[in-house]
UniProtKB/Swiss-Prot annotation:
Quaternary structure annotation from Swiss-Prot or TrEMBL: Homodimer.
Reactions mediated catalytically: L-histidinol phosphate + 2-oxoglutarate = 3-(imidazol-4-yl)-2-oxopropyl phosphate + L-glutamate
Cofactor: pyridoxal 5'-phosphate
A GO molecular function held by the record: pyridoxal phosphate binding
GO biological process: L-histidine biosynthetic process
Pathway recorded for this protein: Amino-acid biosynthesis; L-histidine biosynthesis; L-histidine from 5-phospho-alpha-D-ribose 1-diphosphate: step 7/9
Protein name in the entry: Histidinol-phosphate aminotransferase
HAMAP family from the UniProt entry: HisC_aminotrans_2
Keyword Transferase appears in the UniProt entry: yes
Residues bearing the modification N6-(pyridoxal phosphate)lysine: K222
Length: 364
């Protein structure tokens, strides 16, 4: 009994190492996880209160159309409710887009060093992948546009990019969209949208009126701090959203996630506080890296990719032994680098103290 061969060829996603595993492995009582770009400040108290009010309704199926969340989010974004599409995290939307548009004989264009699930979903659907290297850690949109051919169905653009944290600018994206054929779907994955402070970052929702072949993906897993509840969403033309509904599973988002997302959306003070504290934390890292003479990519996210010029897996293991979980650059296509989530001030102080010992050779 064997599944399809191409499924076996698809890489299995490797999440950040679980905290409990590290505690058991190293006999530690305290571990900080700075590996999965989660919000170290948690989630809005309003979201937690909304969840508690639904605990007597767990026997009931959720609203399959996410109607209340749909209306709230449409009002917040200034779009029609019919322009929204919900998934069990934006990961599921990536899967559904791939299922709807990719097949044998087609291809997708993507960056070489970007979010791994674009590649995995393409392989599963039997599509070819055209990978374009990053340019100074940024999507090379000019080269990606040139790579599009008659078999191209989807172009994946992660903005800000994971794992480099870099952005493509408004002018770069507009030039790219003008070059892209109207029958090629451009997927803008904006999972870290709310963290961005760079004024050159594109505001893409208004672009939907001009580009019906554009879909924007965002999530409640990052700055909203609801990663455990898996609520992602897409914004696109009504026609495109309608076509994706054909591949959406029934009841794919849960009641607790829907009510928490509605409450979190209404607490923009919490979002602003998290964004501000994230930039303060980012400065802790960049100031230290500058002092130590280390190179890093300018990040508009809640993580930073730094070149320690050492074996990535060895540094990863040294940090683990000290109760700190990060992501080795070897797993991300950046040997010698580590990707580090920005934590609380105390968490940042801890990892920077250990990194200094590693960089200076004090920690063997």
């Amino acid at each position: 009994m064997q599944p399809k061969q191409r499924i076996l060829n698809a890489p299995v996603y490797q999440p950040g190492k679980p905290i409990d595993d590290v505690k058991r492995e190293f006999g530690l009582t305290e571990v900080i996880k700075l590996a999965s770009n989660e919000n170290p400040f948690g989630s809005s108290p309003k979201a937690k209160a909304a969840i508690s009010e639904q605990l007597d309704n767990l026997a009931l199926y959720p609203d399959g159309a996410s109607l209340n969340l749909r209306w709230d989010l449409a009002d917040f974004l200034g779009v029609k409710p019919s322009q929204l599409f919900f998934g069990n995290g934006s990961d599921e939307i990536l899967l559904m887009i791939s299922r709807a548009f990719l097949s044998e004989g087609t291809n997708a264009v993507m960056a070489t060093q970007t979010f791994s699930q674009y590649r995995s979903n393409g392989i599963i659907e039997g599509a070819d992948l055209i990978e374009v290297p990053l340019k100074d850690g940024v999507h090379d949109l000019e080269a990606m546009a040139a790579a599009i051919n008659e078999q191209t169905k989807v172009v994946w653009v992660c903005n800000p990019n994971n794992p480099s944290g870099t952005i493509v600018t408004t002018s770069e994206l507009e030039a790219f969209m003008k070059k892209t054929p109207k029958d090629v779907l451009v997927v803008l994955d904006e999972a870290y949208y709310e963290y961005v402070v760079d004024p050159e970052y594109p505001q893409t929702v208004p672009m939907l009126a001009e580009y019906p072949n554009l879909i924007i993906l965002r999530t409640f897993s990052k700055i909203y701090g609801l990663a455990a509840l898996r609520i992602g969403y897409g914004i696109a033309s009504e026609e495109l959203i309608s076509s994706l509904e054909h591949v959406r599973e029934p009841f794919n988002t849960g009641t607790l996630g829907q009510v928490a997302a509605r409450a979190a959306l209404k607490d923009q003070e919490f979002v602003k506080s998290c964004r501000d504290r994230n930039r303060e934390g980012m400065k802790q890292f960049t100031d230290s890296f500058d002092e130590w003479g280390l190179s890093y990519y300018p990040s508009q996210t809640n993580f930073i990719l730094v070149d320690l010029k050492m074996d990535s897996d060895e540094v990863f293991k040294k940090l683990l032994s000290q109760g700190i979980i990060v992501r080795s650059g070897n797993a991300l296509g950046f040997p010698g680098f580590q990707r580090i989530t920005i934590g609380t001030k105390e968490q940042n102080d801890k990892i920077l103290s250990v990194l200094k010992e590693i960089v200076t050779g004090a920690l063997k």
